[in-house]
Design a protein with these regions (language model features):
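Intrinsically disordered, low-complexity linker/loop segments enriched in Gly/Pro
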Residues: 83-87, 105-114, 122, 133-137, ...
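PDZ domains, with a preference for the canonical peptide-binding region formed by the helix
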Residues: 101-134, 341-343, 347-354
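Short, flexible surface segments
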Residues: 68, 95-96, 267, 320, ...
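Interdomain regulatory linker/hinge segments that flank or connect interaction modules
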Residues: 4-56, 236-284
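Conserved PDZ fold ligand-binding element
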Residues: 88-110, 324-327, 331-332, 336
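PDZ-domain C-terminal substructure recognizer with occasional recognition of PDZ-binding tails
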Residues: 40, 44-51, 61, 94, ...
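Serine endopeptidase catalytic core focused on the charge-relay Asp
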Residues: 143-313, 317, 326-327, 335, ...
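PDZ/PDZ-like groove recognition
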Residues: 62-94
Length: 356
């Protein structure tokens, strides 16, 4: 059984940032050898529904998302003037909860949470939380710390940011990226997004992957209205989605539309991975070694391009969302890397990304 681990690096108000972590799989070479032979049996194309054309991208973007409410990381004990430790939220709040309002007032940032708690005047607060898609109201009594300030005793987050790869843009200006969800690094749960944006980014350094240690992009995100590329409105199991900006639409003038493929059209053999290792998107040769058109499990690839292997060691963090092309069609995007062999990994079908 293969173990998949998806994680996301959190940074707060910084310009230099590591890439969004591509999902990591643990596997042995032998498992790939055993499945490659059976993968040669290709399924006949039966789907007659016309797939749309898109602009395949393959360049890095800065990703910034604000959470829906503030997300609970953990509860904590508070030192008081009574020379004791107290944790008002222990047993009431759980890791991964989202606090969306206090006493009916919306909470969308850490600052709003702190302000509401400090103004409680020692009275109980009603916290409206979302836990695993269930809405709950809980009552909590803040306590005063040694400085006399009222506290809840909870660590929270209200944003995430990183670098990932833009997969495609549709003719009507919608985009898809990453091919997998952004999960919180502490809770392991999918981040609930209130709003977010794509921004221009520049890759400054590449850390090569090696057996047992995935590599990574390290770059700069330019947070400015002049570098804004689009709005993020969804964080799903198939990636992040949104609308591109006027600036991004101008860049599409230099691009060409490409047909997308049905799952059944993806076959074992030669394909290309598009990513911007040297500044501009380029196509690098890969081998599709297993297809699973009848499932949501995606397909498996192996990097064979000598230049890409020399530069990155294979699939690295930040390549999540790199489009895959076969027979002139976009067939999917890279999503996972095998930690024991970074030349191999998983991909999501384009059809699944488009039908999310």
């Amino acid at each position: 059984m293969q173990m998949k681990i998806t994680y996301f690096k959190i940074r707060k108000a910084v310009a230099i940032i590591f890439a969004i972590a591509i999902a990591v799989c643990c596997a042995h070479h032998s498992s790939f050898q055993s499945v490659a032979a059976t993968a040669m049996k290709n399924t006949a194309v039966q789907n007659t529904v016309q797939m749309p054309q898109v602009y395949p991208c393959g360049f890095p973007v800065g990703i910034y998302m604000e959470t829906e409410g503030v997300m609970v990381v953990t509860t904590a004990q508070i030192p008081t003037n009574m020379e004791t430790l107290s944790s008002p939220c222990e047993g009431s709040l759980q890791q991964g909860d989202y606090i969306t309002s206090i006493n009916g007032n919306p909470v969308n940032s850490k600052e709003e949470l702190v302000s509401s708690v400090e103004a409680c005047a020692g009275q109980p607060l009603t916290l409206h939380i979302v836990r695993e898609q269930e809405s709950l109201d809980i009552s909590v009594l803040p306590i005063q710390d040694t400085s006399g300030t009222y506290r809840l005793g909870v660590w929270v987050k209200d944003d995430v940011q990183g670098i990932g790869t833009l997969t495609y843009i549709s003719e009507d200006g919608h985009f898809g990226a990453l091919g997998h969800p952004i999960n919180d690094s502490d809770t392991g749960k999918r981040v609930s997004v209130r709003k977010g944006g794509l921004y221009e980014s520049q890759i400054q350094m590449i850390i090569r992957g090696k057996n047992g240690t995935p590599g990574s992009f390290c770059g700069i995100i330019c947070y400015d209205t002049s570098t804004f590329l689009g709005n993020i409105y969804e964080n799903t199991s198939c990636g992040i989605y949104g609308n591109v900006s006027a600036l991004m639409k101008e860049k599409l003038v230099r691009s060409a539309l490409m047909q997308t493929a049905h799952k059944e059209e993806v076959v074992c053999g030669k394909a290309f991975l598009r990513c911007a290792v040297n500044g501009e998107p380029q196509d690098y040769e890969v081998e599709i070694i297993k297809t699973q058109p009848g499932s949501t499990g995606g397909f498996q690839i192996c990097v064979t391009d000598k230049l890409l292997l020399e530069k990155t060691g294979g699939i690295i963090q930040g390549m999540s969302g790199s489009p895959l092309i076969q027979n002139g069609k976009m067939i999917g995007a890279v999503t996972h890397v095998f930690v024991n062999d970074p030349t191999k990994g998983y991909a999501i079908y384009a059809e699944d990304m488009l039908n999310h």
